[in-house]
């Protein structure tokens, strides 16, 4: 299985299993969050011999159902497993069908201008940041009065850095783009429909 930049829920977008991961070309990184099993991993993956923090191949990556895997943009990563539980995939077809285009200078709000949901974000070929300002309910109790929580996804004019898969956009989130228009395309498969759960502390 080949994954590019984006978020992947184990059991929905990739089967549970023990994987070997290798960059096909370029450099990337993975971030694994598995609260149930207490597994938290950040690992750079690529073929730069001068980067001591980077692994050419990562072995024995254990992905358990319900864990969240983030693949950073920059390279396509090959995930190989001899024990992937493909028969246990339980994602549902995304009920959303319509794509949403956001132009530079435009602000669009999930739940008002387009439905909340799980989207693949595609950028026009330019340097670009997608700014997602979350509702105040996602602020921590220690946040300053005027503070807003902003999540940023960056794009670059390279083939593997112009999209980010399976981005949760909960109701009330304001979407802006800084350098080029983006298109929000509904992801093929979804797990939980609590799209805000991803951003809860």
PLM features: residue spans?
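Short, flexible, glycine/charge-rich loop motifs used to bind or transfer phosphoryl groups or to couple energy/partner
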Residues: 9-10, 59, 109-110, 165
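A glycine-anchored, Pro-Gly-centered beta-turn/N-cap motif
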Residues: 4-6, 10-18, 106, 113-118
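A charged, solvent-exposed segment within the mature domains of Sec-exported extracytoplasmic proteins
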Residues: 110-112, 116-129
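Primarily secretory-pathway and cell-envelope proteins
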Residues: 1, 25-103, 123-201
């Amino acid at each position: 299985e080949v994954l590019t930049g984006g978020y992947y829920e184990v059991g929905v977008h990739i089967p549970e299993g023990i994987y070997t991961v290798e960059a096909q070309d370029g450099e990337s990184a993975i971030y694994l969050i598995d609260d149930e099993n207490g597994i938290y991993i950040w690992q750079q993956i690529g073929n730069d011999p001068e980067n001591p923090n980077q692994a050419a191949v990562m072995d024995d990556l254990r992905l358990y159902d319900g864990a969240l895997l983030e693949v950073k943009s920059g390279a396509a990563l090959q995930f190989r497993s001899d024990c992937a539980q493909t028969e246990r995939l339980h994602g549902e077809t995304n009920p959303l069908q319509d794509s949403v285009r956001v132009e530079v200078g435009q602000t669009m709000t999930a739940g008002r201008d387009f439905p909340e949901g799980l989207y693949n974000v595609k950028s026009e070929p330019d340097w670009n940041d997608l700014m997602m300002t979350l509702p105040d309910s996602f602020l921590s109790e220690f946040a300053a009065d005027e503070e807003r929580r902003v999540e940023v996804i960056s794009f670059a004019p390279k083939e593997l850095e112009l999209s980010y898969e399976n981005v949760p956009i909960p109701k009330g989130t304001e979407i802006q783009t800084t350098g080029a228009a983006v298109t929000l395309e509904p992801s093929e498969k979804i797990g939980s429909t609590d799209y805000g759960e991803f951003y809860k502390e």
